[in-house]
Every structure is written in C-alpha cells, then in structure tokens.
Design a protein with these regions (language model features):
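Conserved donor NDP-sugar-binding/catalytic core segment of glycosyltransferases
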Residues: 73, 77-121
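C-terminal catalytic/acceptor-binding lobe
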Residues: 150, 170-227
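N-proximal low-complexity "stem/linker" segments adjacent to membrane-targeting elements
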Residues: 1-28, 34, 38
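Short glycine/serine/threonine-enriched helix-capping/active-site loop
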Residues: 9, 93-98, 197-199, 204
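Glycine-rich, basic loop-to-helix element that forms the pyrophosphate-binding segment
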Residues: 44-58
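Short beta-strand-to-loop acidic/aromatic patch adjacent to the donor-nucleotide binding site
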Residues: 62-73
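A recurrent flexible, glycine/aromatic-enriched loop bordering the glycosyltransferase active site
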Residues: 122-158
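Short, acidic/glycine-rich phosphate-metal binding loop used to engage nucleotide
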Residues: 40-47, 73
C-alpha cells in the first residue's frame, strides 16, 4: 500500500510543533502505519522550496503527498479514505475551491487586490475556523465533492507520481502566497482535474492581505496574464 505522507513546514521546533493543530492531527492518527509525516521544522525558507524537496524525495519513495499548513486540524476520522476515493478519479484534491473563477482573480475566493469576494455560487467546500483551541465558526462555501479550477493551499493532495509523470513542481518565486493558485493553473494546463473533497477540518488562522500578499498577487497576475 502506498503511504499517505503529510508534508508540513513550521517555524516551530519539533517539540513545539506537536502542540500545533497539525501536530495534534498527526498524533491523532499515529496508530495508522500508512500515514507518515515529513516535517520541516525551524523552517525559514519558502513553502514551495520545501514542498519541492518532498516531491523530489518521493521519486525513490512514492507516496500520496498531502501538503498542509501547521495551523490546520483534521477532525475527520475517515479523511484518508475520502482522500483516496477522491484521487481515484482526480489528480489534485483540496478542501475549498472555486469552480468558475473570474479572469484576474487574486485568490480562489477574491477577485481583486482589495479583497472583493467572487460569486459564492462558484465556491465549493467547507472549512471551520478556530482560535488555536476551539472551533469558532464555519465557512460554508457550497457543496463539496465537485470539480473546481482553484483550491485553497491550506490542504493540497496529489500522488507523487502525478508530479513526476507530468513534470509538475511548485513555483519557488511564490514563498507563501499564491503558490496554490499557480499549481492549480499548472495542473489545468496539463489537462489534469482538481477536486474539492468532503474532508472536515478546522483552520486555526485568519487570512491576511498585507503588502507581501499584494506583491505576490501581482507576480501571479504577471505570470498568468489575467487568467
């Protein structure tokens, strides 16, 4: 059985990482031998560099790679089964996304630099919000289990073979923002399908749209010319 390998970057050391939402998740499923973790602790470089290192390492050790932020807690006892079923017919899986993004969107859910939300009818999936300890609210976007064009990078999963067979990698010019949208565009260019699965999770964070985000958004728009 091919392993499920959770790939995560964190600024925490290994001991403190265990107390993060993702650290708690990994411990919660530690009894399942086919679920592994590849951790980049005390990390000071961009996510894409580390994610690409994980993809490269999987050439000789194939896996179902799950790229997850350290502030995400998976609260679904059957998430690995849902994920496997979703990847039977699709190539990239997430928890929230957009079926019909407008040209020039700066996020899967945002249309411009000012944070204007796109048409909710094109959204898919559901992610809960938390404060680091408790669930505080639900972001109910729309029904999951549907194909989309863009997904949120808080959780992205694909088989390592898909990356290798299609010469796909994360673009390292995107260190933290917009790498998710960029990867989705790459998958679409290759004719590969993207899917939002019904996996329950809590995101213990709030999104920020500061100067670094806007600079990254402009790089993304320049690369994809308004797609």
């Amino acid at each position: 059985m091919i392993p499920i390998r959770i790939v995560a970057c964190t600024r925490h050391n290994r001991k403190d990482f265990a107390e993060t939402p993702l650290g708690v998740t990994i411990q919660r499923f530690s009894h399942l031998s086919f679920i592994e973790a590849q951790l980049f602790t005390n990390n000071t470089v961009g996510l894409c560099q580390r994610y690409n290192e994980a993809i490269e390492a999987a050439k000789n050790d194939p896996a179902l790679l799950v790229f997850v932020h350290d502030d995400v807690e998976i609260v679904d006892w059957y998430w690995y089964m849902r994920l496997g079923a979703s990847l039977d017919d699709h190539h990239l899986v997430g928890l929230a996304g957009n079926c019909q993004p407008s040209p020039g969107q700066t996020s899967w859910a945002i249309t411009d630099m000012e944070g204007t939300l796109s048409d909710r009818q094109s959204w898919a999936g559901c992610v809960a919000r938390g404060n680091g300890e408790y669930l505080t609210s639900w972001d109910v976007f729309a029904s999951p289990n549907r194909e989309v064009s863009l997904i949120d990078g808080l959780f992205m999963a694909a088989y390592s073979k898909t990356f290798h067979d299609n010469d796909l990698r994360f673009d390292e010019q995107f260190t933290f923002h917009h790498y998710d949208m960029d990867l989705c565009r790459q998958f679409t260019e290759k004719g590969l399908s993207i899917y939002v699965s019904s996996i329950s999770a809590i995101h213990h964070s709030q999104g920020l749209m500061g100067p670094a985000w806007k600079e990254s958004a402009q790089r993304y728009l320049d690369k994809w010319q308004g797609l």
